[in-house]
Amino acid sequence: MDSSRTIGLYFDSALPSSNLLAFPIVLQDIGDGKKQIAPQYRIQRLDSWTDSKEDSVFITTYGFIFQVGNEEVTVGMISDNPKHELLSAAMLCLGSVPNVGDLVELARACLTMVVTCKKSATDTERMVFSVVQAPQVLQSCRVVANKYSSVNAVKHVKAPEKIPGSGTLEYKVNFVSLTVVPRKDVYKIPTAALKVSGSSLYNLALNVTIDVEVDPKSPLVKSLSKSDSGYYANLFLHIGLMSTVDKKGKKVTFDKLERKIRRLDLSVGLSDVLGPSVLVKARGARTRLLAPFFSSSGTACYPISNASPQVAKILWSQTARLRSVKVIIQAGTQRAVAVTADHEVTSTKIEKRHTIAKYNPFKK
């Protein structure tokens, strides 16, 4: 591969799917001159992906981890309420429930959950959330049904280094994000497919640029790039494979690859399905090599935390909008990527109805 091309994808920035709005921080009085952040919910509908009526509601919660009590205190009043020390913000994806009830009541039910947590470790530092108590309406959620969820601490806890390895820890839900989407449209690409490589393959990557609304004085800007129009983040996602040769064994030209990619009729959006995520929809025909990267309805979900945990955690509390999306064709092995130029293809739609909205569990 001796040259490079980029396919720029068109998107409508006015659509809700091109934005992810943050939760506004609202303080409420709780007496004695104290205030706390008011619980809030956010609802996003993704019916623009398909016409299916078999909708599910994906539930993502954001809240805070507290340490309950003090192990070092051995004497005290029995009537005293144990002290709750705020340690860090966190995210817990519960899974989905059928879209058959009142969504506001569903969000309210999440606030009544009793969840404890503790640290663990495998090849990565883990946070294990245990569901002690949950309302009936949430029982079909995967995490509630399993009674626990073990997640990567770096991806799901704002400051995992602040979480001790002992003591009683409690996760308190404060923000609930509900995304209504046809169930079959939420498709997370198998890790095995993402690791496939070969000299006879081209990798298709999505270069996504996201504008982030952030106070210039916030420490969050240290993790973002700056332009005349504000701050932004770049993401690089692996979205598929294509063969370097055709059925006759002849080398496939970049022009032919571009035509194949444009026939996919790709569109891209932002949503909160498995945490802040980039959603990709291919409305055109998909080749055999592309099949593992999309659901039967042509959709794929890319949690931003897998590409950049730091950017994903910024989007927990900041409004984000798609700025640009490009498809980049790269060589099929990492060694070849290192020594060859890339190829950009430019024509992908941005679903403007996809937004991550304002919600700020821990705005700095």
Curated annotation (Swiss-Prot):
Q: Note the Gene3D superfamilies from the entry.
A: Viral matrix protein, C-terminal domain (2.70.20.60), Viral matrix protein, N-terminal domain (2.70.20.50)
Its annotated compartments are:
Virion
- Cell inner membrane listed as a keyword: no
Q: Mind listing the UniProt keywords for this protein, alphabetically?
A: Host-virus interaction, Viral budding, Viral budding via the host ESCRT complexes, Viral envelope protein, Viral matrix protein, Viral release from host cell, Virion
**Pfam families on file:** Matrix_Paramyxo_C, Matrix_Paramyxo_N
**Chain span(s) of sequence motif FPIV motif:** 23-26
- What Gene Ontology terms describe where this protein resides (cellular component)? viral envelope
User: Any idea what this protein is called?
Assistant: Matrix protein
- Which organism was this protein described from? Newcastle disease virus (strain Chicken/Australia-Victoria/32)
Q: Gene symbol?
A: M
